[in-house]
Amino acid sequence: MDDAFTVDDLIACYARGVFPMADAREDESLFLIDPERRGVLPLGTFHIPKRLARTVRNGPYEVRVDTAFDTVIENCAASRPGRLDTWINHPIQRLYGQLYARGLAHSVETWLGDELVGGLYGVSLGGAFFGESMFSTARDASKVALVHLVARLIAGGYELLDTQFLTEHLAQFGVMEISRADYRRRLSKALATPGDFYGLAAGATGIDCLQAISQAS
């Protein structure tokens, strides 16, 4: 894929069910992925382990939205023990920054005091949210962000949370695999549904998020 790939091309890719990746951080090229089996997280059956629910309910974290998007994606791209490289290269980082500027990409951030210790980012189109990546430097920090994301999507009337792939880490929350054809059907319905990423009340607490998720089950 050449340098002519624009943010509008990226939006069109998501709308037809494909997404970009790179082979390595320093590789400037992109390629498109269209998995035969797609990971999705049904919002109505999201599972929260008991210990995580206690952390969400009692702290010590504060969760913010869209206050440090660039820092979140930078952390997601950083090398970590057991993962020396990343699929998030500089063109991807630039394109998602442009999506964020258009209000189509968002970050959910977990803070411990003034320190960003976890978070995730993704793309929002209609009633579909495409989770891209997450990071954590403190216990359960990215998981707390995921709980807040799910509550936000439920409150905003979203139909689809696309996780791209099913991993052992995501399976504990109820992520499942569906066929490409089933995914396309769900995506088409979700894109036709208006989703409000800011539908969750400002200042919603962890308890508020747990209640929203429980009511949707």
Swiss-Prot record:
Taxonomic classification: Bacteria, Pseudomonadati, Pseudomonadota, Alphaproteobacteria, Caulobacterales
Known catalytic reactions: N-terminal L-lysyl-[protein] + L-leucyl-tRNA(Leu) = N-terminal L-leucyl-L-lysyl-[protein] + tRNA(Leu) + H(+); N-terminal L-arginyl-[protein] + L-leucyl-tRNA(Leu) = N-terminal L-leucyl-L-arginyl-[protein] + tRNA(Leu) + H(+); L-phenylalanyl-tRNA(Phe) + an N-terminal L-alpha-aminoacyl-[protein] = an N-terminal L-phenylalanyl-L-alpha-aminoacyl-[protein] + tRNA(Phe)
GO MF annotation: an example: leucyl-tRNA--protein transferase activity
GO biological process: protein catabolic process
Any single Gene Ontology cellular-component annotation: cytoplasm
Subcellular location field: Cytoplasm
Protein name: Leucyl/phenylalanyl-tRNA--protein transferase
Task performed by this protein: Functions in the N-end rule pathway of protein degradation where it conjugates Leu, Phe and, less efficiently, Met from aminoacyl-tRNAs to the N-termini of proteins containing an N-terminal arginine or lysine.
